[in-house]
Design a protein with these regions (language model features):
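N-terminal helix-rich structural modules
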Residues: 21-214, 219
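Bacterial Sec-dependent N-terminal signal peptides
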Residues: 1-21
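Glycine- and acidic
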Residues: 34-41, 94-98, 161, 263-271, ...
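Alpha-helical coiled-coil heptad-repeat register
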Residues: 57, 161, 176-179, 186, ...
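Active-site-adjacent "gating/activation" loops or surface patches in catalytic cores
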Residues: 230-266, 354
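A short, flexible low-complexity segment enriched in Lys/Arg and Gly/Pro that occurs
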Residues: 73, 143, 224-225, 259-277
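A conserved hydrophobic secondary-structure block that centers on an alpha-helix together
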Residues: 164-175, 265-280, 287, 291-298
Length: 371
């Protein structure tokens, strides 16, 4: 009866919100259910995320309150199917936050991310839920499961373990605190990086500064400057602007200027400095890993990867280094020789020269004609 009541509540809730003017509720009704970004507004995210959290909490409660013995269907499969709305919204929100953010999205992220971290902890640290998952896991050898079901069971159980399900007392609360802190730190790091990237512009006002650049890149730079109500050509640290400039610009000083701006992001004495943030992230990750019984965060992360441990990673890197070094040295020699043909015998190729001269070498070897 109680399980039926919870199900009815879920159905009623979904019926109510489906009628709302929010694209996240219900199907998108687009080809292949592609995300309708043109219909999604900033104000749609928060209510949908909060509703998604509420719905998944109800779904988790239904699993816990199920009077039947825990089995693959009523526990593992039910857990896998939970949180569909939340996953749907968070996937879009996360992508927009990293690819096309704005002040409103960043402000919302500061509010939402701690809630998502808390929600995740509430699930993986739920003792009753983990008890049912563990009950199914302990009888995995006797269950008639397909390979896919076995993998899902293994993944579900290990995910709980990796997210603190076996911790007790103060260790459990410390895990909550550390993961919440880590979510805030990583968000701040990403926001600082994005803000500093967006804030930088190299404005050129002399036509001769554009030597070597394709016309399409010059036009794009002029449009960027125009959008900022500036005269000239504006180049940014975004890939569509940065990469072509480093590849084609004949002006070495400007290449160096843009290169240094790109590679020293968030290290300057301003509000976007990430140096202390990086240290805090590393230390917090270390504490989490050690709390879970690992030597360090690398060991924790690699446990579920193909490499499995740091030793295997370094072994592979050393093998690659040995295999690729002769080729890299030959390529550098060819690029250095080409650069010296143009600039003189004392010229030394620097990092901001690499894309420029490697592109010239490619053109020379392949006899490419740029249209």
């Amino acid at each position: 009866m109680e399980r039926l009541l919870i199900t009815l509540i879920l159905v009623c809730t979904m019926n109510n919100i489906t009628n709302a003017q929010n694209p996240f509720y219900g199907q998108y009704h687009t080809p292949h259910e592609a995300v309708p970004f043109d219909r999604i507004e900033t104000e749609h995210y928060e209510p949908a995320i909060l509703e998604g959290i509420k719905l998944q909490n109800a779904e988790i409660e239904a699993i816990i309150q199920n009077p039947e013995k825990a089995d693959f269907t009523n526990t593992i499969e039910a857990f896998e199917e939970s949180g569909k709305l939340l996953d749907k919204v968070v996937a879009v929100f996360g992508n927009m936050l990293s690819a096309e953010t704005n002040d409103d999205l960043q402000e919302l992220a500061q509010k939402i991310m701690p809630l998502l971290s808390e929600h995740s902890n509430n699930i993986t640290l739920n003792e009753k839920l983990f008890a049912r998952v563990k009950e199914v896991y302990n009888q995995k050898e006797t269950l008639q499961l397909t390979q896919e079901q076995k993998q899902l069971l293994e993944n579900a159980y290990n995910s709980f373990i990796r997210h603190g399900a076996n911790l007790e007392g103060e260790a459990r609360e410390e895990y909550r605190r550390l993961t919440t802190e880590l979510s805030k730190l990583t968000l701040t790091f990403s926001e600082n990086n994005l803000k500093e990237t967006n804030a930088y512009q190299m404005l050129l006002t002399k036509k001769e500064s554009l030597a070597g650049l394709p016309e399409i890149i010059i036009e794009a730079a002029a449009e960027t400057a125009k959008n900022e109500e500036k005269e000239g050509w504006a180049f940014t640290l975004h890939a569509p602007s940065y990469i072509p400039f480093m590849t084609y610009s004949d002006n070495r000083d400007l290449r160096q200027k843009l290169y240094m701006a790109y590679n020293t992001k968030c290290t300057h004495d301003n509000e976007f400095n990430n140096i202390d943030i990086v240290k805090k992230i590393a230390n917090t990750r270390m504490k989490i890993a050690q709390l879970l019984g690992y030597k360090d965060y690398a060991e924790y992360t690699l446990k579920k990867r193909m490499a499995e441990n740091s030793k295997s990673v370094y072994k592979l890197l050393n093998q690659l280094l040995e295999a690729y070094t002769p080729t890299a040295q030959q390529e550098y020699k060819e690029i250095q020789e080409l650069a010296r043909e143009e600039q003189g015998a004392d010229f030394v190729v620097m990092p901001w020269d690499w894309s420029y001269y490697s592109n010239k070498l490619k053109d020379k070897k392949l006899s490419l004609i740029h249209i």
